[in-house]
């Protein structure tokens, strides 16, 4: 089930670009500032929403069936015995949620990165991806599926020579070490990269063969 709210009847490519840039700069001003005030920040499988079309220009309300949510819960059926194992479960759960939600929101064909599918319907930039991944993580946390990690504010990295980039973040409960959960580099439904946040902040990018469209096994956890 879905209900779509679009920021404007016809959002031009220029407006999308300006919106995405502006959203990135806004994230540097305060903790986890979302780009719209109608984003559900306490999501539930029965009611949450998904950003798409760059900079959350479009927002679609989604409801999972009991069967769909049970599929997600089953990823955690065997409790993780250590944080690394749970990070693998998180990767699988995020990929599954993207696969289930894609047909409801028109985002099944989302391509990794911003530019390969820029301007096409249902495409996502890092603002969309980081908000959506945070939404999924919050639902997992809300239903007690995360034993070793908690969900924290998103993070943005800045560079003089490239665009700002934003990711979802989890924190290991025992060590307080934070991990980036970054699905932006990958096509819809692929398991996201999970890596130490400090490594991600240093400008980390995946090897070309692991990035979207490059073949290989995408989304490996970086130790």
Stretch-by-stretch model annotation:
Residues 2-18:
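Bacterial N-terminal signal peptides that target proteins for export
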Residues 33-54:
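Short N-terminal segments immediately surrounding and downstream of signal-peptide cleavage
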Residues 202-223:
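Low-complexity, Gly/Ser/Thr/Pro-rich intrinsically disordered linker/tail segments
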Residues 89-149:
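Mid-length scaffold segments of soluble, non-membrane domains
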Residues 52-59, 64-82, 110-119:
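Acidic/histidine-rich, surface-exposed loop or edge segments in extracytoplasmic proteins
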Residues 138-200:
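Hydrophobic/aromatic-rich core segments of domains that either
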């Amino acid at each position: 089930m879905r209900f779509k709210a679009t920021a404007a009847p016809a959002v031009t490519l220029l407006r999308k670009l300006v919106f995405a840039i502006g959203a990135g700069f806004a994230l540097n001003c305060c903790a986890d500032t979302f780009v719209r005030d109608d984003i559900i920040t306490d999501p539930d499988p029965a009611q949450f929403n998904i950003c798409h079309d760059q900079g959350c220009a479009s927002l679609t309300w989604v409801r999972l069936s009991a069967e769909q949510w049970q599929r997600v819960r089953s990823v955690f059926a065997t409790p993780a015995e250590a944080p690394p194992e749970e990070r693998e479960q998180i990767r699988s759960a995020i990929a599954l949620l993207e696969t289930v939600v894609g047909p409801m929101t028109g985002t099944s064909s989302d391509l990794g990165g911003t530019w390969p599918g820029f301007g096409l319907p249902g495409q996502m930039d890092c603002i969309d991806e980081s908000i959506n991944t945070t939404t999924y993580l919050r639902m997992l946390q809300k239903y007690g599926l995360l034993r070793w990690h908690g969900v924290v504010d998103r993070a943005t990295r800045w560079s003089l020579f490239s665009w700002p980039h934003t990711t979802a973040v989890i924190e290991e409960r025992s060590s307080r070490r934070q991990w980036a959960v970054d699905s932006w580099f990958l096509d819809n439904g692929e398991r996201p990269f999970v890596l130490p946040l400090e490594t991600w902040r240093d400008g980390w990018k995946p090897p070309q063969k692991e990035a979207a469209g490059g073949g290989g096994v995408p989304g490996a956890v970086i130790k």
